[in-house]
Amino acid sequence: MNITYYGHATVGFEIDGVNVLIDPFLTSNPHTDVDPSTLRPDYLLLTHAHFDHIEDVELIAKASGATIVATHELATYYEKKGFSVHGMNIGGGHAFPFGRVTMTQAFHSSSFDMGDTPVYMGMPAGFIIETNELTVYHAGDTSLFSDMKMYGERFEIDVAFLPIGDNFTMGPTDALDAAQWLQAKRVVPIHFDTFPPIKQDAQAFCDQLHRRGLLIEPNTTIEI
């Protein structure tokens, strides 16, 4: 599996020839200069509706024809705008061509602004993706929560993408607990350093995980 990290919470996967992109935030992302219109994912997975997770959804979906996978409310919003969608809800799973996706809970919020009015778009979520090669967990934006222990018991997680920025999500201390509960073989910190309130020392976080910690520099593709 090839994994590309674009900074913040935007992660791309190439799985058996299928391209998946999670939470496309590129245009305003200070960690990347990638032109979102050049990306051609087959699927766009959205954890929630905040701007820093969906900024480039429409641009990329128009250019690529990607199917948008999101909570029912958010998927319905994009479906009414003419996009191909697959709606899900917390606890549900579906077998896609690249693997089985389970939508997990996340403790956060999920809205975007329509004019001056914030509109809520269902629950925030995370994704556990089981492929022929690896099992990956993208936690989305979340606090630490006890069901992560159950995820670690039920799934053999190879790579976990965990937010460490604090303030809006869990910080490094709670993310270390999450890493232990999940029993993930590798842990990649995300959602840090994009804005001043979420400035963190990601290398120090990884050092505390020893060989399990994996710091991926933005705009880098690695093979796992």
UniProtKB/Swiss-Prot annotation:
This protein's UniProt keywords: Hydrolase
- GO MF term list: hydrolase activity
Listed Gene3D superfamilies: Ribonuclease Z/Hydroxyacylglutathione hydrolase-like
Provide the disulphide bond pattern.
Answer: none
- Which InterPro entries does this one have? Metallo-B-lactamas, RibonucZ/Hydroxyglut_hydro, UPF0173, UPF0173_UPF0282_UlaG_hydrolase
Lineage, top-rank taxon, reads Bacteria
Pfam families membership = Lactamase_B_2
**UniProt keyword Chloroplast present:** no
Return the similarity comment: Belongs to the UPF0173 family.
Spell out the NCBIfam families in the cross-references. Answer: PRK00685.1
Question: Which protein are we looking at?
Answer: UPF0173 metal-dependent hydrolase EAT1b_0495
UniProt source species: Exiguobacterium sp. (strain ATCC BAA-1283 / AT1b)
Q: From which lineage does this chain's organism come?
A: Bacteria, Bacillati, Bacillota, Bacilli, Bacillales
